[in-house]
Amino acid sequence: MAAAVLLAVGLRAARRTLAAAGARGAQVRGNAGVSDGSEVAKAQKAAPGGASPTIFSRILDRSLPADILYEDQQCLVFRDVAPQAPVHFLVIPRKPIPRISQAEEDDQQLLGHLLLVAKKIAQAQGLKDGYRLVVNDGKMGAQSVYHLHIHVLGGRQLQWPPG
């Protein structure tokens, strides 16, 4: 019980930190961990150039906290702060690729690695009956953080078409 309370307090503190980062202009998904349904609006306002640090680059350099599930030399995996399914985590490359449409031929090995890591962590999270991988690209694709990332969602029956 005490451990659960400490975990809840820690998560709330992390979410407040992320919300404060958003107030300072960083790219933040969700509002203190609660989906507010405005991801499309955020995508329309997001800066696509990669000129300023994204929330993901700040998680990579550990200046923002995250619930990290896995990391290696090429990528980092952490839980989404505004989960859209019982299990929802992100796989991001350490290399700052703003959009999947901006990936180069030289990124082929890295992109394959991201997919294999997504599979590995999905299995570790108990998603044996299936899951969904999502990559948003650009404003029309509702990309709200311009650092390539793969959403992995599962833990319930997902619906189709997605929207």
Curated annotation (Swiss-Prot):
<dbReference type="GO" id="GO:0043530">
    <property type="term" value="F:adenosine 5'-monophosphoramidase activity"/>
</dbReference>
<feature type="modified residue" description="N6-acetyllysine">
    <location>
        <position position="119"/>
    </location>
</feature>
<dbReference type="InterPro" id="IPR036265">
    <property type="entry name" value="HIT-like_sf"/>
</dbReference>
<feature type="binding site">
    <location>
        <position position="80"/>
    </location>
    <ligand>
        <name>AMP</name>
    </ligand>
</feature>
<feature type="modified residue" description="N6-succinyllysine; alternate">
    <location>
        <position position="128"/>
    </location>
</feature>
<feature type="modified residue" description="N6-succinyllysine">
    <location>
        <position position="45"/>
    </location>
</feature>
<keyword id="KW-0444">Lipid biosynthesis</keyword>
<dbReference type="InterPro" id="IPR019808">
    <property type="entry name" value="Histidine_triad_CS"/>
</dbReference>
<dbReference type="GO" id="GO:0000166">
    <property type="term" value="F:nucleotide binding"/>
</dbReference>
<feature type="modified residue" description="N6-acetyllysine">
    <location>
        <position position="139"/>
    </location>
</feature>
<dbReference type="InterPro" id="IPR001310">
    <property type="entry name" value="Histidine_triad_HIT"/>
</dbReference>
<feature type="active site" description="Tele-AMP-histidine intermediate">
    <location>
        <position position="149"/>
    </location>
</feature>
<dbReference type="GO" id="GO:0006694">
    <property type="term" value="P:steroid biosynthetic process"/>
</dbReference>
<feature type="transit peptide" description="Mitochondrion">
    <location>
        <begin position="1"/>
        <end position="17"/>
    </location>
</feature>
<keyword id="KW-0752">Steroid biosynthesis</keyword>
<feature type="binding site">
    <location>
        <position position="136"/>
    </location>
    <ligand>
        <name>AMP</name>
    </ligand>
</feature>
<feature type="binding site">
    <location>
        <position position="63"/>
    </location>
    <ligand>
        <name>AMP</name>
    </ligand>
</feature>
<feature type="binding site">
    <location>
        <begin position="142"/>
        <end position="145"/>
    </location>
    <ligand>
        <name>AMP</name>
    </ligand>
</feature>
<feature type="binding site">
    <location>
        <begin position="149"/>
        <end position="151"/>
    </location>
    <ligand>
        <name>AMP</name>
    </ligand>
</feature>
<dbReference type="GO" id="GO:0016042">
    <property type="term" value="P:lipid catabolic process"/>
</dbReference>
<dbReference type="Pfam" id="PF01230">
    <property type="entry name" value="HIT"/>
</dbReference>
<comment type="function">
    <text>Exhibits adenosine 5'-monophosphoramidase activity, hydrolyzing purine nucleotide phosphoramidates with a single phosphate group such as adenosine 5'monophosphoramidate (AMP-NH2) to yield AMP and NH2. Hydrolyzes adenosine 5'-O-p-nitrophenylphosphoramidate (AMP-pNA). May be involved in steroid biosynthesis. May play a role in apoptosis.</text>
</comment>
<dbReference type="GO" id="GO:0005739">
    <property type="term" value="C:mitochondrion"/>
</dbReference>
<feature type="modified residue" description="N6-acetyllysine; alternate">
    <location>
        <position position="128"/>
    </location>
</feature>
<dbReference type="GO" id="GO:0006915">
    <property type="term" value="P:apoptotic process"/>
</dbReference>
<keyword id="KW-0378">Hydrolase</keyword>
<comment type="similarity">
    <text>Belongs to the HINT family.</text>
</comment>
<dbReference type="GO" id="GO:0005759">
    <property type="term" value="C:mitochondrial matrix"/>
</dbReference>
<feature type="domain" description="HIT">
    <location>
        <begin position="55"/>
        <end position="163"/>
    </location>
</feature>
<dbReference type="InterPro" id="IPR011146">
    <property type="entry name" value="HIT-like"/>
</dbReference>
<keyword id="KW-0547">Nucleotide-binding</keyword>
<feature type="short sequence motif" description="Histidine triad motif">
    <location>
        <begin position="147"/>
        <end position="151"/>
    </location>
</feature>
<keyword id="KW-0053">Apoptosis</keyword>
<keyword id="KW-0809">Transit peptide</keyword>
<protein>
    <recommendedName>
        <fullName>Adenosine 5'-monophosphoramidase HINT2</fullName>
        <ecNumber>3.9.1.-</ecNumber>
    </recommendedName>
</protein>
<keyword id="KW-0496">Mitochondrion</keyword>
<keyword id="KW-0443">Lipid metabolism</keyword>
<keyword id="KW-0007">Acetylation</keyword>
